[in-house]
């Protein structure tokens, strides 16, 4: 019985930006007596059906965006006599769909770290269960990924997870519902061992692939203190102390190490935390700005963010600590108006963001937005390729709409066009070159231009429908840029690098 793990993708670039962590974690969860699993990341290369034989087990991890491709692979694998198992956020939300459309014998709902071995045992006995509930395991149970199975020279960034869960409740995000609002944090020892393993292999750019690297805010501590909730305050301080211990040890890694993470904007009001991030080589962070207006922030349940000039000043605080921000903005909110687009572009430039992404509001399953939208769509007769809009991920990619939400004052095409104009403005050669001034050398600035253009080409898919010719052209363009760009991120292997010790052991 051969085990296959497949990460579906609609396009393959040959080179990928970041390692799909789940693939290598489940490889670690595969008992050794089954042998090393066959790993397929379709962002690199398409699945070869001929590798799948009767009696094999094929595990497919899906999110909403790649579910349709995942179902195609599942049906193919089942037709070849394999046991088909689905997991991931989307399969956890729609297990029956994976069985009906993807040929699933089984679905793992929730974390798969511990459940996967049980799935394989049942498949080996010819009796897989329809549903396995992995639940939410504790941080101490998170498995380190099997990075020894990585193909050489194919990824720009590696990925390590330090915490799962996010205490926020943004309306457009499913993380707090699927991963929970209680931070489940790995020990510093486990995180450092995995990072050192990657540095030994030549990765120096590593994403801390967390839902929120800043799980305890100063406001959280103040609130617990005002409420005289000693137990809650102690719990929060322990989580915060663990963050600082981790960053203190990350700071001992070689100086050319670069970490990138995801964080809420509230961290900008915590100079001690930002200082520790800088020392820990955390030089980049994705920050969900979402909207530049107070009304827009209320639309997405994110009114803990600031707006206007206050927003600009808060974002600049990251840069003052040498942390480069990838700002994420949403267009198409109910309160958005035509003038919102230019105002957002201006804020992105004034706030000294290094990168930015501008996405159109899409109601994803598992979110508050989706539940509200699905309710309003009851009885709507609209079908595309026979599929209702509320199951838009099942519409073939070539004709799938990019915007589903009806806006009170703007047509979908206007939102798409104005969104594209903001992408074009932020990623024009002139503006990118101006942003590159933080780099000292011409070579470095030219590399920054190339990386910026690659990011824009790979992620600025804002067409009202995904035209297959445009996708093919974009894929060729991105593939041409990806290989030379990957070399910019590569580091030299450090086989003798040791795991940094806690501060008390160094004194």
Predicted segments with their positions:
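Alpha-helical structural signal in soluble globular domains
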Residues: 29-33, 76, 80, 97, ...
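Structural recognition of alpha->loop->beta junctions
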Residues: 97-118, 276-285, 343-358
């Amino acid at each position: 019985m051969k085990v296959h793990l497949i990460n579906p993708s609609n396009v393959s670039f040959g080179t990928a930006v970041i390692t799909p962590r789940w693939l290598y974690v489940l490889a670690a969860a595969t008992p050794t007596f089954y042998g090393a699993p066959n790993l397929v990341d379709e962002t690199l290369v398409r699945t070869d059906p001929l590798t799948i034989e009767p009696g094999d087990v094929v595990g497919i991890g899906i999110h909403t965006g790649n579910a349709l491709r995942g179902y195609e692979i599942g049906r193919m694998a089942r037709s070849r006599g394999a046991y088909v198992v689905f997991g991931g956020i989307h399969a956890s939300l729609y297990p029956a769909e994976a069985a009906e459309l993807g040929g699933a014998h089984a679905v793992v709902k929730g974390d798969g770290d511990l459940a996967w071995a049980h799935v394989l045992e049942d498949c080996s006995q010819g009796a897989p269960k329809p549903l396995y509930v992995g639940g939410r395991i504790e941080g101490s149970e998170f498995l380190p990924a099997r990075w020894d199975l990585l193909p050489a020279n194919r990824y720009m960034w590696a990925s390590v997870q330090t915490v799962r869960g996010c205490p926020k409740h943004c309306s457009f995000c499913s993380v707090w519902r699927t991963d929970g609002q209680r931070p489940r944090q790995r020990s510093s020892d486990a995180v450092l061992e995995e990072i050192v393993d990657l540095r030994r292999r030549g990765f120096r750019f590593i994403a801390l692939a967390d839902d929120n690297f800043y799980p305890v805010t100063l406001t959280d501590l103040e609130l617990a203190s005002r409420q005289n909730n000693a137990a809650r305050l102690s719990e929060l301080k322990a989580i915060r102390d663990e963050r600082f211990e981790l960053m203190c040890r990350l700071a001992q890694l070689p100086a050319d190490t670069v970490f990138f993470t995801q964080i809420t904007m509230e961290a900008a009001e915590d100079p001690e935390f930002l200082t520790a991030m800088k020392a820990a080589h955390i030089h980049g962070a994705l920050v969900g700005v979402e909207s530049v207006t107070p009304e827009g922030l209320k639309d997405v349940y994110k009114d803990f963010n600031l707006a206007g000039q206050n927003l600009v000043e808060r974002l600049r605080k990251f840069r003052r600590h040498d942390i480069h921000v990838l700002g994420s903005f949403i267009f198409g909110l109910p309160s958005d108006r035509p003038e919102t687009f230019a105002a957002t572009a201006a804020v992105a430039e004034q706030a000294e963001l290094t990168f930015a992404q501008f996405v159109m509001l899409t109601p994803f399953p598992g979110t508050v937005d989706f539940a509200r939208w699905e309710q309003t769509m009851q009885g709507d007769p609209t079908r595309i390729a026979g599929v209702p809009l509320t199951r838009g991920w099942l519409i073939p990619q070539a004709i799938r709409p990019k915007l589903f939400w009806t806006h009170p004052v703007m047509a979908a095409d206007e939102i798409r066009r104005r969104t594209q104009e903001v992408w074009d403005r932020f990623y024009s050669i002139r503006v990118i070159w101006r942003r590159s001034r933080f780099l000292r050398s011409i070579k470095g600035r030219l590399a920054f231009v190339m990386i910026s253009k690659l990011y824009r080409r790979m992620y600025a898919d804002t067409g009202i429908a995904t035209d297959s010719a445009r996708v093919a052209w974009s894929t060729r363009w991105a593939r041409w840029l990806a290989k030379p760009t990957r070399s910019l991120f590569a580091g030299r292997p450090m086989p003798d690098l040791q795991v940094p010790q806690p501060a008390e052991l160094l004194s």
